[in-house]
Amino acid sequence: MYSMNRVLIKIWGLLCVLLMANDASAQRVMPVIKIYGDFFDEYTEGKIIVCDPDSLYPDTFNMLAKYRGGTSKNYEKKNYAVKLVDEFGLKLSASILGMRDDNSWILDAMAVDKARMRNRVAFDIWNAMDVKPYYYEREPKVRTGISGKFVELYLNDDYNGIYCLNEKLDRKQLKLKKIKDDVVRGVLYKGFDWNGTCFGDEPEPYSNDSSVYQGFETVYPDVKDNGKTEWEPLIEKEDFVVNSSEDVYAAEYAEHFDVPMLMYLHILINTIGAIDNRGKNQFFYIYDITENKKMSFAPWDMDSSFGRDWRSWVYEDSYDKLWFENHIITQINDVDSTFLNNVANLYFKLRKTLLANDSIKSRFDEYFKLFEETGAAKREYARWNGTDDIELNFEEEKEFIHQFIDIRMAFLDGYYGDYSGVRNIPSEISDGIVYDIFGRRVYNPQPGQIYIMNGRCVYFRK
């Protein structure tokens, strides 16, 4: 394994303390992680050292690590997939920074996110919803979201910026049944592309020897670990959505899909304006296909949200469009007029608490405050501002996100209000006149601001 002198490790433990306190203006400290090795698209050996401000000594592990992601690999600031191993290269599990005991971790660079926190905040909201899948009574410890902690990362002694150390969403987190006596029970799929993942395409020939199918990848059973997987449960759902008559769909959709989970996801994805999560960047799973083939869902990779897309650009349609309208949902709407009424009632219940504007804003504000008070914001700016044509300004981005939340929630109040009877925003403003987000007429729109014109949100470019 990747070797490192024990004396150097002890020295690094002392340096951790210095690194976390080296900014005289810092009021707080963030955990520091240092990784050693040469990393590529495939796993290579390395070392990871974790310095927790609440611990006296650092934790040191052998690891295998590689670049993680699809398009994110094109950016200079890389994501890393990390697997902890022992001195013999065998799987090793450990709890890091108070999170779950596991061997597989993600170091999320958040390179396209000008706030460096969108995905984390989205998961914080989802976790606060505390949504339970249909098999919760059998698995009370099931979790459909992940925990994550912000850290400052050093790559081979060079500062590499703010990262979020995340858990993985996997069979273990979702408490799916393991293979037993060579019989597949729990299954877990992930949407990585738009091809097929919105359940609008006819089923195609498939092979259980392949890890991919129509934009899905199998997470469990994993072909690499088990030699095969099981695609049939997913194909059955695809066939049901595409080929069922309206009468059959109306009578049976609740047997096929976890409807309460769909309701919460409808609200989450629309609240954050996640433009890349209707099928892609979503998990699909069944607890035990030998007993019940009902499918449930969970979100993933929600960085294209809160007003920006996967390139970090302002995405105007994210302000006043719906973003969770895959074919499962649209066909439920077609055959069951009560579905959106129930979603709307749930939405307005959540609006009183964790989806109140100030509640959502405060989640961002706490992380922005953490970055500022630890000095991490300054270091991130110095290291990465302008790289890959992405300009950083945390104060401006905070205001941008606040503005998005006000506009987006006003739009959703109107949309869901049509189904619940709740009306607490004015009717559409039109006639080509420009208004600010508070409905006041604007005679001199300023570049870089968002306004309302003809009932739509418009971003005036610089």
Please identify what each model-predicted range represents.
Residues 417-438:
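Residue-level detector of functionally pivotal "anchor" positions at catalytic/ligand-binding pockets or at interdomain
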Residues 2-12:
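Bacterial N-terminal signal peptides that target proteins for export
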Residues 21-26:
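Boundary at the C-terminal end of the N-terminal hydrophobic targeting segment
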Residues 88-89, 95, 100-112, 116, ...:
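Internal "kinase-insert"/substrate-recognition segments embedded within catalytic cores
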